[in-house]
Structure formats: structure tokens, C-alpha cells
Swiss-Prot record:
GTP binds at residues 25-32, 72-76, 134-137. Residues 72-75 are annotated as: G3. This is GTPase Era. PROSITE patterns: G_ERA (PS51713), KH_TYPE_2 (PS50823).
Amino acid sequence: MERGMTDIETAETPATHSGFVALIGAPNAGKSTLVNQLVGAKVSIVTHKVQTTRAIVRGIATHDNAQIVFVDTPGIFKPKRRLDTAMVTTAWGGAKDADIVLLLIDAERGIRGDADAILERLKDVRQPMALILNKVDRVKHETLLALSAAANEKVPFKRTFMVSALTGSGCKDLLDYLAQALPAGPWYYPEDQISDLPMRQLAAEITREKLYLRLHQELPYSSHIETEKWEEKPDGSVRIDQTIYVERDSQKKIVLGHKGETIRAIGQAARMEIAGILEQKVHLFLFVKVRENWGDDPERYREMGLEFPH
């Protein structure tokens, strides 16, 4: 008996989808926590201090046949100084370049202040937009419905999602939507890559997180951390030297702490987390230097991935 042209039945491979999704919102709405939850790994630092995210951090999630590149932007607020202006400009730039824009609103805080101002400006955005209400586990259902209606009255959102960035509730529905809404096309990054942030920069971000968590009240966020040295050792360990730049001597004393206790605690917490990510032993050395008005130095902005506002 004659066979057909082939013994193997071929099924058409599903088309891959990929694209950039900008996550915008007011400071401390939970953007970084949500990106980490959606990616399934830590790609953005999280603290209780407002404006922790300074530059755009891309977290990469693979869901079904789609690669979703999340752009975690700085919180949008009314800028008061040069660094603030650079961060807000960066945030809107991230939204302008994205395929889809997600607005994250803290459901506990509702629409007021910065969130209301963002909604007004979103009226001029042409990309598809979706609304995400965060911390829904802490708010009554009737309040959530009223909040959703008020936001959708101002801006024509394609979809509204109710999530808890902390627990992950509602995140699968959001990923399902993004996977089918992004354009068909090849993936931008290898399948196992979860961020495009260089490891030297991520290590500095982790130390900055530990600094803020330890000194939440005492230290203003006008501090900056640079990874000055990264040396792979023959025994498989790595030596990392980082400098914490502050603007005044009084801030340096706070970071050092009594007999160096504070900086040791910060270093230990950062070293453990960096070692966990690298899966190798880490020798972390922290130094504190005063650099007055570093916030007016264009070179520092370039290192943070920000455009220096003139």
C-alpha cells in the first residue's frame, strides 16, 4: 500500500508575540512589587521610601508563546528639583515608547493628587491602555467598582484588572491579556533572561535598597551608589567594591553608624542577596564618600540611565 507524501503530521507552530509594556503610576503605588511578581523574580528594588525606582528597569516575563518586557518606570509626581524632573521625564518617555501602557493605582489611596494628574495626562496617550487597581484585598468591593468607574470615565481603558502585587492575586489574568494583546513577532531576549539590567548595576541597586530599608527615616533619598570594582577570583568567588555617595558629612555619619555597625548591617544584607542571585560567594566592600551636589552632576545621571535636565 502506498504511503502519502509524509508519515509525520505537521502542526503549525503558534506565532510568538512580544512587546514592551510600560507600568506607570504615582510613587509607591506598588509598581516594582508588581513587576517582580509578574516576572517571578526580583528585577526591581522595593522599599517604603517614595521614588526608589530612578531609571527604567526592564523585567522580562515569558507567558505562553509571548515575551512580555515590562518597563518599570519611576513614580510620576510634581517634580521639585533636577533629579525629580529627570525621573518624571524618564517615566513618560517609557510610556511613549511602549506597545501597551498600564496605569497602576493604589486602591487604598484612590484617585487623588498625583494619580488624578496622571489620568489627565493619559488622555493624550495613543497606545492601548489598561487600568490596574492594586491592594484590592484591603478595599471593599463596592469601593473598587466606584474607583474603576471613575478612572474609566476619564480615560478609555481597554481592560481593568484588580490585583494584589504582594500575593499575586489577579496576576495570571493580566499576563493572559498581555500575551494575546502584544503584537506578533520574534522575542527580543533569550528565553531564560529576566532583566536587561547589568549585574554591576543590579548589585548597586540591591545595596541601595538595603540602605533605604535600614535608614528609612534618617536618610533622604539624595544618595547614590556605584559599583567601582568587580573582580572574579580564582576560587570562584567575586570581590565587589561599592561607594555610597552622600551630600553631607552628617549623612556619612548616619550611614556608617556607631562604630560602623550600620554600614556593616547594610553590607551583610546586600552581600547575602547578591550572592543568592550570582550563586557564588561574594566579598562586598562598602565605602562612604561625601560628594556635594552630586544631583547636579551630568555624569551621575548617565550612570543611572537618566537624561540630565538643563
